Amino acid sequence: MESSGMTQLMRDLAPESFDDLIPLVALYRPGPLGTGMVEDFVAGRHGKKTAKLLHPLLEPVLKDTFGVILYQEQVMQITSVLAGFSLGQADILRRAMGKKKAKELDSMKEAFIVGAAKEHGIKRELAEEIFALLQHFAGYGFNKSHSAAYALVAYQTAYLKAHYPVEFMAATLNSYLANAEKVSWYINACREMGIQVLPPDVNVSGAGFSVDGHSIRFGLAGI
């Protein structure tokens, strides 16, 4: 979450709530970053771009992501809403798209086209276009529950780092106690944050890094 790319994305998106953090995790991956999805999402978030939906029924499914198919669950919802797929069928299609199973996709595509015509009178050409769109985004789609879980961990750690920086950095150093390179890197990070790392002291130091007032005491096991 602290990489330069993610930091820039957060500046561009300007999150205002926890719900705004969830799509960040799904957006900052190789697939979305190379397709224009990120730019479309950010523009939609700030009201600079209106999503062009292929069918009005897509609006409630894609409203929260500004017309961008971002999550795997949205692929499942769209097939269910437009073609009457059961959630079981929708999940089979999602997996087939993710693994690019050609035979399975061909049969599911025809079922989608037939279902869309039966449920909502959608013409074959439009159904094929929507299916192609789903297939394109399914390769990049991220599980929303996973994205939410990662966002929560990021939010919690960011809170601790902001409000309890000494304790947070001491715990971080202890997590890399056996990795001299990482320890050195995080000691430099402490200095940049204005946190002093005190030298090891046989009379004061414990095995690990510990909080010593507003400083961190070097742990004996890290020598």
State the predicted function of each range.
Residues 1-223:
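Noncatalytic, beta-rich nucleic-acid-contacting surfaces in large DNA/RNA-processing enzymes
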